[in-house]
């Protein structure tokens, strides 16, 4: 049966594979000319990510160009928010803006339970089309934002440098924040199940801003809600591999391993050999390559991939960057990353 599964799914399940699978976070996006051309025709990010034809087309752009082992849904971690009654806009170069930041008990109590098949049917449509058309030549990936990161956006109202508003809530009104986090955990768990039902074969949870927490606050406000999302998903889809990514996670790797996820995606600020010692063997590892290396020459890109792989050869591993690919990355360097990655062998 292992032969019938796409490579990334096989590797994520812990089956024996000939080489590590390779894909990139943000592999569909601004570094690709074909994407920038489409963006000129459709300047609204929400339209690009919520119109199923456009989202499908963008999701497939890197697959046509590079044949990665994973095809990830083109969407955004904030996409489920309107289904809960929180509206947002994404302004080019500024990032997301929440129209009415959530800061009171009344607002939290008025949030709707997320019904993904109703408010996010376009996501289901895209995933089922991807699954059908990619036809197991690659693994279909879904993703969500974790409760802490979603809460950080909706409380702050936008991206933040120091997260003073949500931290003020955490330390002054912890019960209010826990209520919000719990609401998000249930909704995000349901959303992930909907993605899996629609065609996602592996899913990734992005807790992008959990790296801003001290370990003790991670244990209070991030870890338990990541775990709750995982438990909701595993209750219905115990076999679907779940990846967890946190930017700036070097201080909480052991804690991430206790959430029930199958794979931990590393940023590039931690030594991968050290990470292997800190993460239990049963848990796979993804990423760790500095996206900045893709601004280097081909030789340096290949050497960095080889160095990373040689340090982790005896572990379940998915080759990826330690963060999303950066805008302005030369496309031919992305090509080198994929081509060289596919030459690795166990």
UniProtKB/Swiss-Prot annotation:
Keywords: Cytoplasm, Decarboxylase, Lyase, Porphyrin biosynthesis. One of its GO terms (biological process) is protoporphyrinogen IX biosynthetic process. Pathway: Porphyrin-containing compound metabolism; protoporphyrin-IX biosynthesis; coproporphyrinogen-III from 5-aminolevulinate: step 4/4. GO terms for molecular function: uroporphyrinogen decarboxylase activity. Its EC number is 4.1.1.37. It is found in: Cytoplasm. Its main location: cytoplasm. GO terms for cellular component: cytoplasm. Gene3D superfamilies: 3.20.20.210. CDD domains: URO-D (cd00717). Substrate binds at residues 26-30, 76, 153, 208, 323. It catalyses: uroporphyrinogen III + 4 H(+) = coproporphyrinogen III + 4 CO2. The record marks 76 as: Transition state stabilizer. Homodimer. NCBIfam families: hemE (TIGR01464). Belongs to the uroporphyrinogen decarboxylase family. HAMAP family: URO_D. Catalyzes the decarboxylation of four acetate groups of uroporphyrinogen-III to yield coproporphyrinogen-III. This is Uroporphyrinogen decarboxylase.
């Amino acid at each position: 049966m292992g032969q019938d599964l796409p490579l990334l799914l096989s590797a994520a399940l812990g089956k024996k594979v000939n080489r590590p699978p390779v894909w990139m976070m943000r592999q569909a996006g601004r570094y690709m000319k074909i994407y920038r051309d489409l963006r000129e025709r459709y300047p609204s990010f929400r339209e690009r990510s919520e119109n199923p034809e456009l989202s499908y087309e963008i999701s497939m752009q890197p697959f046509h160009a590079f044949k990665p082992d994973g095809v990830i849904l083109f969407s955004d971690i904030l996409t489920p928010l309107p289904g809960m009654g929180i509206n947002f806009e994404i302004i080019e170069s500024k990032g997301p803006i929440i129209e009415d930041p959530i800061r009171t008990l009344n607002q939290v109590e008025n949030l709707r339970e997320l019904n993904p098949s109703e408010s996010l049917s376009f996501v289901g449509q895209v995933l089922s089309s991807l699954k059908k058309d990619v036809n197991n030549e690659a693994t279909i990936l879904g993703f969500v934002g974790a409760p802490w990161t979603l809460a950080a956006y909706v409380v702050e109202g936008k991206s933040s440098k120091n997260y003073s508003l949500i931290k003020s809530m955490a330390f002054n009104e912890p019960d209010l924040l826990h209520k919000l986090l719990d609401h998000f955990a249930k909704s995000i768990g349901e959303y992930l199940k909907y993605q899996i039902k629609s065609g996602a074969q592996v899913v990734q949870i992005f807790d992008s801003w959990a790296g801003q927490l001290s370990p003790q606050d991670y244990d209070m406000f991030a870890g338990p809600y990541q775990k709750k999302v995982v438990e909701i998903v595993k209750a219905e889809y115990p076999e679907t591999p779940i990846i967890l990514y946190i930017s700036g996670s070097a201080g909480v790797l052991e804690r991430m391993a206790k959430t029930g996820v199958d794979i931990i995606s590393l940023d590039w600020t931690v030594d991968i050999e050290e990470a292997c010692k800190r993460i239990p063997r049963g848990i796979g590892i993804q990423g760790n390559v500095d996206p900045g290396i893709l601004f280097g020459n081909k030789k340096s890109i290949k050497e960095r991939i080889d160095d990373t792989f040689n340090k982790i050869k005896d572990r379940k591993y998915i080759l990826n960057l330690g963060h999303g690919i950066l805008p302005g990355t030369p496309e031919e360097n992305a090509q080198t990353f994929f081509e060289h990655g596919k030459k690795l062998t166990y």
